[in-house]
């Protein structure tokens, strides 16, 4: 992405990057570079301990927590709970995208990425996936 200019305003970018350090830290690196270029960045992380601890070290970044949901491995009644949690995560993502007036969503991989990337796609917002 290019630097903002008088003809190109800063973008509002959401990065879904939580769940594991392998998804989180690349997302943080991308966020830092985008901020340097003048864009507004919101990072979506899971409620996992690794995300909470790491986010404390980056006070200049805007972190939001989204429920981390993984699909049950075998067909069971757990699918009902999964479906409800997935619906709530997508609804949360849609509301957040509206709140921050998102221009683009970057999914860094992992189960935390699906709800915001899906919500952005459904809203016609540009989506990017890195894994």
Which residue stretches match the model-derived regions?
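A short, glycine/small-residue-rich beta-strand->loop->alpha-helix junction that serves as a flexible
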Residues: 15-28
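Structural detector of well-ordered beta-strand residues that form the stable sheet scaffold
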Residues: 14, 42, 105-106, 128
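Active-site-proximal region of nucleotide-activated glycan assembly enzymes
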Residues: 2-9, 40, 61-62, 122-131
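Glycosyltransferases and closely related glycan-assembly transferases
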Residues: 8-9, 91-105, 114-128
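Gly/Ala-rich phosphate-binding loop of Rossmann-like dinucleotide-binding domains
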Residues: 31, 35, 121
């Amino acid at each position: 992405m290019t630097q903002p200019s008088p003809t190109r305003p800063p973008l509002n970018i959401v990065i879904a990057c939580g769940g594991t350090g392998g998804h989180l830290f690349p997302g943080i690196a991308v966020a830092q570079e985008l901020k340097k270029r003048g864009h507004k960045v919101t990072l979506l992380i899971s409620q996992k301990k690794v995300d909470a601890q790491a986010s404390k070290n980056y006070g200049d970044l805007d972190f939001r927590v989204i429920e981390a949901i993984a699909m049950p491995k075998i067909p069971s009644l757990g699918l009902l709970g999964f479906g409800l949690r997935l619906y709530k995560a997508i609804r949360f993502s849609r509301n957040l995208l509206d709140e921050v007036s998102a221009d683009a969503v970057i999914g860094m991989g992992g189960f935390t990425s699906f709800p915001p990337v899906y919500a952005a796609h459904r809203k016609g917002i540009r989506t990017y996936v890195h894994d």
